[in-house]
Amino acid sequence: VRLGLDLLPHCDWIVIHDGARPCLDELILWRGLDAAQHTGAAIPVIPISDTLKQISDQHLVSATVDRNSFWATQTPQVFRREILVRAHQQITHHVTDDSGMLELLGYQVRVFDGETTNLKVTTPPDLKIAEELLRARAI
């Protein structure tokens, strides 16, 4: 992303999308652009449906975590350009996504509804599900 920002022509908004999420619906983009108007940064989230367990170094369950306060993050993430550029200039250590850099700098990141169909393809079963979703959309 950092290198892409240097090459991108001037614009007010940056939308970052993970290429491993091929089933993006256009409505998510519009929701993101709308949500980002409030704080300059917005990310799609979906509720976590699985039970979450905290595991010790000894591979034992040490706690069951209340999943109601946790959400899974997706892309596209939407940012006002100047905020994202500033974050990339000031944060040089690894973070898992661009919104994490803004959080470290004290920016508020607004959330909006993602979609379970906007899945991340990381395993062969994920690929089969994505293929079926895309095939169904083409009908």
Model-identified regions with their sequence ranges:
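Hydrophobic helical membrane-anchoring modules
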Residues: 118-139
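Conserved strand-to-helix beginnings and helix N-cap segments that scaffold or border functional pockets
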Residues: 1-2, 26-29, 124
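Short, well-ordered alpha-helices that flank and scaffold nucleotide-derived cofactor binding pockets
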Residues: 6, 34, 132-136
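Glycine-rich "substrate-gating" loop/helix at the edge of Rossmann-like oxidoreductase active sites
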Residues: 20, 92, 116-119
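Conserved core of the sugar-phosphate nucleotidyltransferase
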Residues: 23-112, 139
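Short beta-strand-to-loop acidic/aromatic patch adjacent to the donor-nucleotide binding site
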Residues: 11-21
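Active-site nucleotide-sugar/metal-binding loop of Leloir-type enzymes
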Residues: 2-13
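Residue-level signal for inorganic ion chemistry
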Residues: 4, 17-18, 47, 80, ...
